[in-house]
């Protein structure tokens, strides 16, 4: 009888040890990870609110797997429309934070909701230049300065064409200026010439010069005539034609002097 009691005690101890070991093993085992759960039936929105339902297969995946850069649905529907996705699967938008989230493509909100905002930059000012691809405004004075300031280098495009156009405009302006200056100079010269010719008869100094020239001409002709007469008296007769020409010149000079 004592042997039977000892056997039962040994068996009970073995059972307790087995139960204790099983309990320890269960506690040490890792917690099960999130797994895909296939929904029975194809009814839409049959997944829990904290999961996302794949469009084609109907699997329910954790909502945190949505737009994480890894396709968890076979059709990739969990990675579609991620740029403008700002609300949860159930249509409830994320709560607003105390400070507004910025549209700088850098996560500044605790829920990373500003990464999914469909933002647009305000237009550039009149003194600024809009870069084509990177959507940035830079000062207009930076255009064609030999250094690309836009990421796409659009501020340094078509600079040669603009330079040639500026040169053409400058050359045309210079030519127009030269023509205008030449015409003004010619007009001024003509006005001065006409004024001098028109006012000579009314200018006392010009009148005196003309009168002096007439007197000198008469004296010169008279001296020439006297020389010819002396030569004739000495027997050196000049040709008759020369004497007649001298007399006519003397008469012409006297007429001019009388007209003045």
Curated annotation (Swiss-Prot):
Topology Cytoplasmic: residue spans: 230-260
Gene Ontology CC: one annotated term: endoplasmic reticulum
UniProt: Ca(2+) 2 binding residues: 142, 145, 147, 149, 155-156
BP GO terms, sorted: B cell costimulation; cobalamin transport; positive regulation of B cell proliferation; regulation of vitamin metabolic process
One Pfam family per UniProt: Ldl_recept_a
Membrane topology summary: Single-pass type I membrane protein
Membrane-spanning ranges: 209-229
Glycosylation sites noted in the Swiss-Prot or TrEMBL record: 118, 185
UniProt domain LDL-receptor class A: residue ranges: 46-83, 123-160
Bridged cysteine pairs (disulfide): 47-60, 54-73, 67-82, 124-137, 131-150, 144-159
Listed InterPro entries: LDL_receptor-like_sf, LDLR, LDLR_class-A_CS, LDrepeatLR_classA_rpt
Alphabetized UniProt keyword annotations: Cell membrane, Disulfide bond, Glycoprotein, Growth factor, Membrane, Metal-binding, Repeat, Signal, Transmembrane, Transmembrane helix
Matches recorded under Gene3D superfamilies: Low-density Lipoprotein Receptor
Record's subunit section: Interacts (via LDL-receptor class A domains) with TCN2.
Function comment: Receptor for transcobalamin saturated with cobalamin (TCbl). Plays an important role in cobalamin uptake. Plasma membrane protein that is expressed on follicular dendritic cells (FDC) and mediates interaction with germinal center B cells. Functions as a costimulator to promote B cell responses to antigenic stimuli; promotes B cell differentiation and proliferation. Germinal center-B (GC-B) cells differentiate into memory B-cells and plasma cells (PC) through interaction with T-cells and follicular dendritic cells (FDC). CD320 augments the proliferation of PC precursors generated by IL-10.
Record protein name field: CD320 antigen
Lineage: Eukaryota, Metazoa, Chordata, Craniata, Vertebrata
The gene coding this protein: Cd320
